[in-house]
């Protein structure tokens, strides 16, 4: 399992991002990561191993060094992320939570389509988040790429992409894992679990439906793809992994 969180704010997002990710610590024990965007400094990222120390301890120093009004991050039980990507779609960061059951098939398809290599290897396997980025980059726009990734992946994949303009948030096409939008004055957040933003002053704004894609800025949200009509939630998340107040 794992948890993801993102913030689009008119002021610095770093503290909200830090605590929002930390509130997902019950969902993973291996890696934690933060990525932010600042118009002057560009993209910046920090990833740490949290197997022997909690997220809050490992990232305490990064909070004072990272700058930006837009950011995403994660608690991961598997691969290191978020990843920073440069492609024909521009520069973006991406974080995901889910499981790809047809990874070998997707790797072969990528090689046939001219993709020459994968850089991020985790435990001898291709990093699933890099695979998602590779699928997105095969299309003419980020939205088309997200749709394509949702169609090609057998399993489950929920994601947040960070661009210089805002955040793309996409829930798994069958709604197996949740994604929720919160709001407060001057900011919006995207969260895997709702309890992560309640203590940060956010209020519930929107629960994304299965396969729904939205674009998030400090001013508001824009629905780019409406939700589907089929829902298959991960009941194990609700009864075991999930935090009770969510």
Region roles according to the model:
Residues 1-246:
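Conserved short alpha-helical segments that host acidic/polar catalytic motifs at enzyme active sites
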């Amino acid at each position: 399992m794992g948890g993801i969180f993102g913030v689009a704010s008119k002021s610095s997002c770093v503290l909200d991002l830090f605590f929002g990710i930390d509130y997902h610590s019950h969902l993973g024990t291996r890696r934690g990561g933060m990525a932010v965007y600042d118009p002057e400094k560009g993209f910046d990222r920090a990833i740490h191993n949290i197997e022997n120390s909690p997220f809050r301890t490992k990232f305490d120093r990064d909070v004072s060094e990272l700058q930006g009004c837009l950011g995403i991050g994660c608690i991961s039980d598997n691969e290191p992320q978020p990843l920073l990507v440069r492609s024909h779609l521009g520069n973006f960061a991406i974080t995901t939570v889910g499981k790809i059951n047809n990874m070998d098939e997707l790797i072969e398809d990528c090689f046939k389509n001219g993709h020459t290599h994968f850089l991020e290897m985790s435990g001898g396997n291709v990093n699933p988040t890099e695979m998602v980025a590779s699928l997105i980059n095969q299309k003419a726009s980020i939205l088309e790429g997200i749709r394509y990734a949702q169609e090609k992946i057998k399993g489950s994949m929920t994601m947040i992409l960070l661009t210089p303009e805002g955040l793309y948030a996409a829930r798994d096409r069958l709604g197996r894992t949740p994604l929720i939008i919160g709001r407060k004055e001057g900011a919006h957040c995207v969260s895997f679990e709702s309890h992560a933003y309640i203590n940060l002053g956010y209020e519930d704004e929107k629960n994304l439906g299965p396969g729904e894609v939205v674009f998030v800025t400090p001013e508001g949200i824009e629905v780019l793809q409406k939700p589907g009509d089929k829902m298959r939630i991960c009941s194990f998340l609700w009864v075991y992994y999930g935090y009770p107040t969510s």
